[in-house]
């Protein structure tokens, strides 16, 4: 019979957990909860790591953790420190007994692991200091704390472009830690504030809500605020801790929460430790790439399947101010739905850099649906890496990111449709088999073949591995998109539009004929002959250029659409101008048949249940007319358009 437990700061853990005699901690309620039970948490701040002991048995028989209606409930991984002594100037020192941290001291734990690149010469730590909720910056030395310098930008290791800090003056608030046998001393520059009169908190716990055991299925978490987790680096070759995480389970619902200030990742749908734990970084015997290949098979042996792992729902959450990811996952994110989340300020402190940082970073998101999210002011909006097969990215809003998207070493089918990509740097396409349909793409793009890393593809709608392949580039589709250029200015190796595909074949028949009659031996011809691409009814403005063999397209190089994203108190608005004749450019909606078959994965673009797919909704979710406008909106008008988009 369903039981309802209550938790309140005024409660006692020795009480029965009723509304009249509530528990004092969420962890105490979690010890009692069985399938079907509900834990109602009342207003207050709970400084604990909640580790659910048991989950539900099926989607309708869950263990539910929820904030009481209309009440603010905060779970923090930090503790208050109020014993500061003045060192000199605006620098103060606090001495903390190590027993406060238990077995995990964030001021010893470094942010490192596979694919961690910077900083070099020293290590950033999982600890953090907060003044009235605002996070500081770790300093390399105590002298740097005493003499801080403003950090204005970092140079991105990928292509050398500059990424600027949003609030450079905040970088003057710095801290440094010294750890001894019994104590940890934290030095911090409070820039004139008295830390004994203000709220000062420091990271203590690794997570806020994360089960110790795997297989804790069908948990619901809703209505909470969580903050200040000392999460470690979360590459796909290690256990991926998050401030909240599913830990290799099935069927969680994480909804209507606020997550912020996780040192690395906020929400984890990731892998667990037995399938590999930073082996390349630790032992240097094999590359991270090789260990990640092994992790796929280890995951399959450890239950990775639609029946046992994934199928999570992460919706309507606000996620911000995290160092690595808003949402992260490898394998455990498969078959999931990521809907309606607002993700921003991810990776923008630039304290560390590695090849795993994005608002959403997934490996193997098989049949995962990413719809209706708003992602902005991130170093990278989304990154679909390895085995993004059956994945759909639809009706999302991305803007003011250093880069909107990256798709890497995956072979399709991947559908990207009805999105607004408004940042200056649009995409890195290091993949094949992607369909871009009805998007507005305002930034530059890069296309790269990957011929030194062969990655898996799967049987349709399954985790079962069907084979491996390099990324030859191509086998992509572009239908009904609006591309906006940079007025014809040079963009290095980047391109605006689809002219980066010039030289590709344009049909399966042409590709097969050239590969079959080439001069090379077997696989050599498939490296030299470019895979086909399919393009139709795209619009190219302001210097964006079309693929040389796209015959049905609209180009107006001199027309500037003057795209503007405006954030207002009542929402987000998009303003843009369209040229004359745009209302006459109509095309039929795209479906499974039109998208055709894929070369490497040897499958089609269909729905997760295997049924034919119709891309028949626009950005707003409205049903498109049988013939509708290019871009993410069913209706366009000549001249100025102004739309509320969030």
Residue ranges, per PLM feature:
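Short glycine/acidic-rich loop motifs that flank beta-strands on beta-rich extracellular proteins
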Residues: 49-51, 206-208, 230-236, 241-242, ...
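Hydrophobic, small-residue-rich alpha-helical packing segments that form membrane-like cores
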Residues: 262-265, 269-325, 330-359, 363-365
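Catalytic-core region of carbohydrate-active enzymes that cleave or remodel glycosidic bonds
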Residues: 399-403, 412-446, 456-487, 496-542
């Amino acid at each position: 019979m369903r039981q309802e437990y209550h938790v309140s700061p005024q409660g006692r853990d020795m009480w029965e957990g009723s509304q009249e005699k509530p528990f004092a901690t969420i962890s105490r309620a979690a010890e009692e909860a069985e399938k079907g039970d509900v834990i109602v948490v009342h207003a207050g701040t709970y400084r604990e790591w909640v580790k659910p002991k048991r989950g539900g048995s099926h989607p309708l028989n869950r263990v539910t953790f929820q904030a009481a209606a209309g009440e603010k409930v905060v779970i923090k991984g930090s503790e208050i420190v109020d014993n500061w002594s003045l060192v000199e100037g605006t620098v103060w020192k606090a001495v903390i007994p190590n027993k406060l941290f238990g077995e995990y001291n964030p001021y010893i734990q470094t942010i490192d692991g596979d694919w961690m690149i910077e900083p070099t010469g020293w290590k950033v730590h999982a600890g953090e200091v907060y003044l009235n909720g605002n996070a500081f910056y770790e300093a390399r030395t105590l002298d740097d704390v005493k003499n801080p310098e403003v950090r204005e930008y970092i140079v991105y290791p990928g292509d050398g472009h500059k990424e600027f800090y949003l609030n450079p003056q905040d970088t003057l608030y710095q801290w440094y830690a010294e750890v001894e046998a019994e104590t940890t001393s934290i030095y911090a520059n409070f820039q004139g504030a008295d830390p004994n009169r203000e709220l000062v908190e420091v990271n203590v716990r690794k997570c806020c809500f994360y089960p110790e055991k795997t297989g804790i299925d069908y948990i619901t978490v809703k209505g909470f605020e969580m903050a200040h987790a000392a999460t470690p680096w979360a590459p796909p070759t290690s256990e991926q801790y998050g401030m909240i995480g599913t830990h290799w389970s099935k069927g969680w619902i994480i909804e209507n929460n606020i997550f912020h200030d996780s040192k690395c990742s906020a929400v984890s749908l990731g892998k667990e430790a037995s399938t590999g734990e930073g082996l390349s970084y630790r032992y240097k015997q094999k590359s991270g790439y090789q260990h990640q290949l092994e992790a796929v098979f280890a995951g399959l042996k450890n239950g990775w399947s639609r029946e046992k792992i994934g199928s999570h729902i992460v919706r309507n959450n606000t996620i911000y101010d995290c160092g690595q990811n808003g949402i992260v996952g490898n394998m455990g994110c498969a078959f999931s739905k990521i809907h309606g989340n607002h993700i921003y300020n991810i990776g923008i402190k630039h304290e560390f850099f590695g090849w795993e940082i994005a608002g959403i970073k997934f490996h193997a998101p098989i049949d995962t649906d990413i719809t209706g999210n708003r992602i902005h002011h991130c170093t990278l909006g989304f990154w679909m890496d390895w085995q993004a097969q059956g994945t759909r990215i639809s009706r999302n809003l991305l803007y003011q990111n250093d880069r909107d998207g990256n798709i890497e070493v995956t072979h399709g089918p991947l559908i990207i449709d009805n999105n607004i990509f408004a940042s200056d740097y649009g995409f890195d396409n290091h993949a094949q088999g992607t369909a871009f349909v009805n998007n507005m793409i305002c930034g530059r793009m890069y296309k790269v073949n990957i011929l030194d890393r062969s990655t898996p593809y799967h049987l349709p709608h399954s985790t079962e591995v069907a084979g491996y392949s390099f990324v030859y580039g191509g086998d992509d589709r572009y239908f009904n998109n609006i591309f906006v250029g940079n007025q014809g200015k040079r963009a290095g190796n980047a391109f605006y539009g689809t002219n980066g595909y010039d030289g590709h074949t344009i049909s399966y028949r042409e590709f097969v004929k050239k590969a079959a009659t080439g001069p090379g031996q077997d696989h050599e011809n498939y490296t030299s002959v470019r895979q086909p691409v399919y393009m139709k009814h795209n619009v190219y403005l302001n210097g964006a250029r079309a693929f040389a063999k796209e015959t049905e397209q609209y180009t107006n190089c001199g027309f500037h659409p003057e795209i503007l994203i405006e954030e207002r108190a009542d929402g987000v608005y998009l303003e843009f101008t369209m040229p004359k004749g745009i209302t006459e450019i109509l095309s039929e909606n795209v479906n499974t048949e039109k998208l055709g078959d894929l070369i490497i994965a040897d499958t089609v673009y269909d729905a997760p249940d295997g049924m034919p797919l119709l891309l028949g909704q626009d950005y707003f979710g409205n049903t498109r007319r049988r013939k509708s406008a290019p871009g993410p909106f069913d209706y366009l008008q000549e001249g100025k358009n102004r739309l509320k988009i969030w």
